[in-house]
């Protein structure tokens, strides 16, 4: 994968709670004026789809299945698709760590 540490570093994690359907923009398909309670009340952890799209654009990636948009323009995230970029990022960090250790060993530190 071309997505690794640079891409992961460009992502901003957020915490949020779902809004009640009545609080959504009335143009969105999930809007329902009669539903005043959120379906999920637990604190959620994740990304903002628009920011993921920007990070993908910044890395010239057009075929990452971790970001989607439906026919109505609603953007979404598929979190399981972030596993491979995360593995790549760990591999890149491991290689950097190995190189730094070698430099320290060579310097007798």
What are these regions (language model features)?
Residues 19, 48, 77-78:
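Poly-acidic low-complexity segments
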Residues 3-39:
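Acidic, glycine-rich loop-and-strand cores that form catalytic or ligand-binding grooves
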Residues 58, 62-109:
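C-terminal intramolecular chaperone/auto-processing assembly modules
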């Amino acid at each position: 994968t071309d997505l690794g540490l640079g891409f992961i570093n460009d992502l901003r994690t957020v915490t949020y709670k779902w809004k009640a359907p009545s609080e959504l923009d009335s143009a969105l398909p999930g809007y329902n004026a009669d539903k005043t309670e959120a379906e999920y009340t637990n604190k959620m952890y994740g990304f903002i789809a628009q920011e993921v799209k920007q990070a993908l654009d910044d890395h010239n990636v057009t075929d990452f299945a971790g970001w989607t948009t439906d026919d109505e323009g609603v953007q979404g995230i598929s979190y399981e698709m972030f596993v491979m970029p995360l593995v790549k990022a760990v591999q890149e960090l491991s290689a950097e760590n190995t190189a730094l250790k070698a430099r320290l060993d060579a310097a007798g530190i």
